[in-house]
Each structure stands twice: as structure tokens, then as C-alpha cells.
Amino acid sequence: MEILVCVKQVPDTAEVKIDPVKHTVIRAGVPNIFNPFDQNALEAALALKDADKDVKITLLSMGPDQAKDVLREGLAMGADDAYLLSDRKLGGSDTLATGYALAQAIKKLAADKGIEQFDIILCGKQAIDGDTAQVGPQIACELGIPQITYARDIKVEGDKVTVQQENEEGYIVTEAQFPVLITAVKDLNEPRFPTIRGTMKAKRREIPNLDAAAVAADDAQIGLSGSPTKVRKIFTPPQRSGGLVLKVEDDNEQAIVDQVMEKLVAQKII
């Protein structure tokens, strides 16, 4: 079984600050981390590899050269190969352009392996820096394969996957044949830590770079020219004011109801 996992290096959102004038993210001095949902996606692939040693896991990331840090972390966790899609032409890509570029890279990697498609492509449900949850589904659309999003449990039998797909009311069970793209939620698993031995081996690994030409990407569909999305402003949500606490003596239920009704009438809610 051939599995590809898309991973991304993201700024630690706990440290991110917004420029109050430009309304852009201030990245200087902000540490970068392995996108948490992508770690869940990788752990799902590693669990399948634990159960079947014939499983091969390929990692793919798109970004600057420093994104190789998360690829090496993924190799240290147990992935077999890793590739970085990096090109100045990709700068400014929105989710549409990113999905297209990654799909082009996936096609090339599959062809290089002598296969038509990867059996399973795994992505985190979203990246914590953009929170769009669009790139995974966009890749599936570009490749013309089924997609199952928000996976909280994955079972593989033969060339079929059965997935518990998380939703607001609980979950639904969805089945699909290979090839399929699946996006992972946090409840899917608990990602393992890289081993010391794996970390040392990963440091010595050469991670190949792929540019736009290598994956036959159309310049009109990548970067700013291929990105119809225009970001007008980035901002932090305003802090909520504290809730109103109503107090009465002797657990007088009628007094509580009267106070609540008085407040609702005063605010013209009723």
C-alpha cells in the first residue's frame, strides 16, 4: 500500500501577533511548528504501517526550505520518504493554487513510483494558520478521487476504507475504495514522538526539492496569478465581556426568574 501524507510547517498561533496598521501576521520571532492536524494524519499512516510492513509512507510539504524541519520530524517518526515543493513562483498561493500545485507534485511522485495513484492520501483537516480546511478537498478534486473529511477513525480492509466522519451531531460511517483522500481530526489518534535513532537518521537524509517546472505546474495557476482569493484584513477577535451573574437569597426561584425577565425586557429581547 502506498500512502502519501501532506504536512505543513506553521507559525505557533499561541505566539502570533497582528500588525495593527497593516493588519498582517507578524512572523518575525515567531517559532514554527508541525501543523498539529497533520501530525494526526501522519500517525494514522504510521498505524497502518505498524499493521502491515509493506506499507510505504511518502511525505510532501510545500513551502520555503525551512519546511524541511517538519519533513525530517516526520521521517524521524517513521515515514519512508519526504519531498519539498518549493519555488518562488508559488509565493502568495491561496488554497486553490496550493491544492493545484500539491496535486501536480502528487502526480509526479506517483509516476516516479510507477503507480497510477497513491492508495491513500492523508491530510490534516486544516492548517492552524489559515483554518480554511480547503486544501485537502481541493487536492482530491484536482486528482479526481473521492474524499472523506474529518476522520476520527479509519479502518482499512483490502482496497476499501471505512471511516467514522465527525460532524456536529456525532459521526457518520463512510466507505470508499482506493484511491481516496482523507483528512484527520485531533480525536483520530495521539501522535507518537520521534525516536532518538529516527531523529539522528533523519538529520542525515537528503530531502529532494521539487520546483514548479519539475511538477509541470502551469504558471497561470500558481502564486498570486493563480489565486483569486484576496485577503482584506487579518485580525484577532475582540475579547468577550464577562457574563452577568444574578444573585438572590434563599434559592428563591421566582426571584431569579423575575430578574432574568427584567433584564430581557430592558434589552428589548422580549
From Swiss-Prot:
Keywords: Electron transport, FAD, Flavoprotein, Transport. InterPro entries: ETF_a/b_N, ETF_b, ETF_beta_N, Rossmann-like_a/b/a_fold. One of its GO terms (molecular function) is electron transfer activity. CDD domains: ETF_beta. Its cofactor is FAD. It comes from the Bacteria. It holds the Pfam family ETF. The electron transfer flavoprotein serves as a specific electron acceptor for other dehydrogenases. It transfers the electrons to the main respiratory chain via ETF-ubiquinone oxidoreductase (ETF dehydrogenase). Belongs to the ETF alpha-subunit/FixB family. This is Electron transfer flavoprotein subunit beta.
